[in-house]
Regions:
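Basic, flexible Lys/Arg- and Gly-enriched helix-loop patches that mediate nucleic-acid binding at interfaces
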Residues: 1-168
Length: 168
C-alpha cells in the first residue's frame, strides 16, 4: 500500500503528519550597488527591490557587501539556510577576484595561507589564477568560513588592490 499525501491523513504516535510546505528558493545574481538586507535605514538600494514579484517573504542566506556581486541565495526554508550558513558544515564559497597587476607567486602563496581576520584565524583558501596580464589578474578563491569581508581583507593583508569581487 502507499499513501496519497493529497487525500490521506497520516498519523504517527497520534500526531498528524501534514504536507510539507512549499518552500521558495531563489538564486539571485546580485549586482554591485545593492545591500544584502531587506530594508536599509540609510536609504541605499536593497536586494528586495530585485525580487519584488516573488510573492513570499524570503531571506538572504549569507551576505555580499554592497560592492560585491554574484550568487546570493534567498529562501523561506530556515533549515536549508542553516545547513548552508552554519560553520560546522564548512560550505565552500568560491569567488572570482580581480586585482591590479600581475599576481606574484609569493602573493598566491600568502592568499593560500591562514589569515588573522578580526581575531579569527581562517582556514587555508584554495586559490588559482584564471587569467593574468600586465594590467590585472583574475583569481578564483574558494573559502570555507565566509567571515565579514574576508576576501577583501585577505587581499589587503597581501598587498593586492582588489578591483572587483564576484561570488560564483
Amino acid at each position: 500500500d502507499s499513501a496519497d499525501i493529497d487525500t490521506d491523513i497520516i498519523c504517527i504516535d497520534g500526531q498528524t503528519i501534514g504536507r510539507r510546505a512549499d518552500n521558495t528558493y531563489i538564486m539571485l545574481n546580485k549586482p554591485r550597488g545593492y545591500v544584502t538586507t531587506l530594508s536599509d535605514e540609510k536609504g541605499r538600494p536593497c536586494i528586495t527591490e530585485l525580487i519584488k514579484d516573488v510573492g513570499k517573504r524570503v531571506y538572504p542566506v549569507g551576505r555580499l557587501d554592497m560592492y560585491s556581486e554574484g550568487l546570493l541565495i534567498l529562501t523561506d526554508d530556515g533549515d536549508f539556510a542553516n545547513r548552508l550558513m552554519h560553520p560546522s558544515h564548512e560550505m565552500t564559497k568560491t569567488y572570482h577576484a580581480w586585482v591590479n597587476g600581475k599576481c606574484s607567486v609569493a602573493a598566491l602563496d600568502r592568499l593560500r595561507s591562514p589569515f588573522d581576520i578580526d581575531g579569527y584565524k581562517t582556514k587555508p583558501a584554495e586559490v588559482e589564477i584564471i587569467y593574468s596580464c600586465d594590467d590585472y589578474t583574475q583569481l578564483s578563491i574558494s573559502i570555507h568560513e565566509g567571515r565579514n569581508r574576508q576576501i577583501r581583507k585577505m587581499c589587503e593583508q597581501t598587498g593586492l588592490k582588489l578591483t572587483k569581487l564576484k561570488r560564483v
